[in-house]
């Protein structure tokens, strides 16, 4: 049995932590879903201005989370497997999504003493209704993976590189430049980054330059932070400092590839952290399903963690990072409990005449 590639378990854990931190920045502080609340009073003190720069850097560092998660998926699923096995995995994932959607909505409805049948229907059809945009895209990639793997296996290294080049042109976009996410191309973008992960698995890039990809990731994020922060603090035309966000298919595409390549070049760690990452790997997706549920999101960022109340405190960054770690730990613990309880349910007994029927 081949040794487990624990560096990718660690990267999967890190990428989900980045997703949670990114949600703190863009949901908890910037309030991207409620633009009328976009005002952030960073500029009212020197400490607040420092925290603005740190928050902008945190947002850009964590912008890569979804991309890296899909690249990891591509790395492991680029090996051909039957559609039946992938379908079964997709069904189990769909049932988990429905479970959390319905359970969380039911608890919220009981607390509010209100019930909306249309909202319940939305929770029962999470993929079709795109309740979770990321999970909708992930499910599509999962079901397409056997066919993408067969295609990738049939390509030479050069052909694979040309395919990635074409997909880069078709998917890269920044503001008014490029295709961006139009005409339903977000799924095409996920196919692109899935195939990037697959390319690393099949063709294993090598060379001394890989050791510098981690530095390229950090320096690019620092440079972008400097550009965004300095331009606003010196030349801003609005009364508030605005946290800049970037689409996953612009600069974060480059930084996510850099981070993924750097991790792929590392030896598999054997530390306690890596061991914990391996143990928690089956529960990582539950972090997204729980904390990003529409009923949990506002409660989490606006009423429990409330990051905007700490913008002028010196410990703001430590508080934000610690709060996100607690969110992850709680979500993982909840899913561990769910699986423990479900394991206590006895399996369905086979029909007494099943063997006889099978022999006919």
Question: Which residues are covered by each model-predicted region?
Answer:
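Loop-centered beta-sheet repeat module
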Residues: 159-206
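Membrane-cytosol interface segments of multi-pass membrane proteins
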Residues: 1-167, 270-273, 303-360
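Alpha-helical transmembrane segments in multipass membrane proteins, preferentially the mid-helix core
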Residues: 141-150, 194-205, 255-271
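Aromatic-anchored segments of alpha-helical transmembrane domains
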Residues: 17-24, 100-106, 164-177, 217-232, ...
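Hydrophobic transmembrane alpha-helices of secondary-active transporters
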Residues: 70-78, 193-200, 287-289
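Small-residue-rich segments of transmembrane alpha-helices in multi-pass membrane proteins
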Residues: 96-101, 193-195, 282-289
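Alpha-helical transmembrane segments and terminal signal-anchor/GPI-anchor hydrophobic tails
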Residues: 207-286, 292-303, 307-320
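Interfacial loop-to-helix transition and helix-capping segments at the boundaries
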Residues: 53-66, 122-137, 175-193, 226-258, ...
